[in-house]
């Protein structure tokens, strides 16, 4: 019988964390061995996610959990301030990482990439675990060959800490890598209110919306002479991310380097 991969989840009290606990607990090839959250007070995971038979209590010290449980994989859904140190601690002791937390900067990603190579363990940084979102990014990248003028609108729940989203950044990067030219700027354009034209990543404007009731949504809008093209993805429930989370956990165990974007594991 194939040995189950031993997994711990950091950020277990968050909305994505709770869904991830359920998904791992329900998968025959994965074993949930610990759950971590800085706000934890010893809660029972079984009570938290409504699955009986899990004898696991929430803990609040990730370094202790890594040392005591020696997992195969750390799944991180914490926050931009914690994720880098969490991943670095795990990689240093040979623990594979799946990072769903956005907010890592280029320097931090390079350091994690170097550490993964030194330790020969895989680390996956995934801006979006929804298969539909990955397809949206791929379609947008293809469309950019023919429609170089493009803007992105990303919409998320009002508790999301960072802007723009990792998905929007990744989409803009893929567009810039694939479009043959970048349109000239409108030099006469000016903002009556600072920031109203959005952020600019390689001449792709990104607009961030934060409202209660939303989960994760993105539109990529292309314009051309006499026509337009809109590519949109909507996540209506966090359960829609879970097939991707489970797949990435299993796939990253076969890698020995940093992987950025789920499309590179499909």
Curated annotation (Swiss-Prot):
Q: Name one GO molecular function term.
A: NADP binding
Q: Could you tell me the keywords of this UniProt record?
A: Amino-acid biosynthesis, Cytoplasm, Diaminopimelate biosynthesis, Lysine biosynthesis, NAD, NADP, Oxidoreductase
Query: At the top level of its lineage, which domain of life is listed?
Result: Bacteria
Which Pfam family is one of this chain's hits? DapB_C
Q: Where in the cell is it found?
A: Cytoplasm
Q: Which residues bind (S)-2,3,4,5-tetrahydrodipicolinate?
A: 157, 166-167
The record describes the protein's role as: Catalyzes the conversion of 4-hydroxy-tetrahydrodipicolinate (HTPA) to tetrahydrodipicolinate.
Its protein name is: 4-hydroxy-tetrahydrodipicolinate reductase
Which lineage ranks, top first, belong to the organism behind this chain? Bacteria, Bacillati, Bacillota, Clostridia, Eubacteriales
């Amino acid at each position: 019988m194939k040995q189950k991969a031993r997994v711990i989840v950091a950020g277990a009290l968050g909305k994505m964390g709770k869904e991830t606990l359920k998904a791992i607990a329900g998968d025959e090839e994965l074993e949930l061995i610990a759950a971590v959250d800085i706000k934890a007070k010893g809660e029972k995971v079984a009570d938290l996610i409504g699955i009986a038979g899990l004898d696991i209590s929430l803990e609040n010290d990730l370094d202790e959990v890594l040392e005591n449980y020696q997992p195969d994989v750390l799944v991180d859904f914490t926050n931009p301030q914690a994720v880098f140190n969490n991943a670095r601690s795990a990689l240093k002791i040979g623990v594979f990482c799946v990072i769903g937390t956005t907010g890592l900067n280029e320097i931090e990603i390079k350091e994690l990439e170097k550490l993964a190579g030194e330790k020969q363990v895989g680390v996956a940084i995934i801006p979006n675990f929804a298969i539909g979102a990955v397809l949206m990014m791929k379609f947008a990248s293809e469309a950019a060959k023919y429609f170089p003028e493009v803007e992105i609108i990303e919409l998320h729940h009002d508790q999301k800490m960072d802007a723009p989203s990792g998905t929007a950044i990744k989409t803009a990067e893929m567009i810039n890598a694939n479009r043959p030219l970048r349109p000239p700027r409108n030099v006469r354009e000016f903002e009556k209110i600072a920031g109203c034209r959005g952020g600019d990543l390689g001449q792709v404007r990104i607009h961030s919306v934060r409202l209660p009731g939303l989960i994760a949504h993105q539109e990529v809008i292309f314009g051309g002479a006499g026509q337009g093209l809109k590519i949109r993805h909507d996540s209506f429930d966090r359960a829609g991310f879970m097939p991707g989370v489970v797949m990435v956990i299993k796939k990253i165990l076969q890698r020995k380097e940093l992987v950025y974007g789920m499309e590179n594991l499909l």
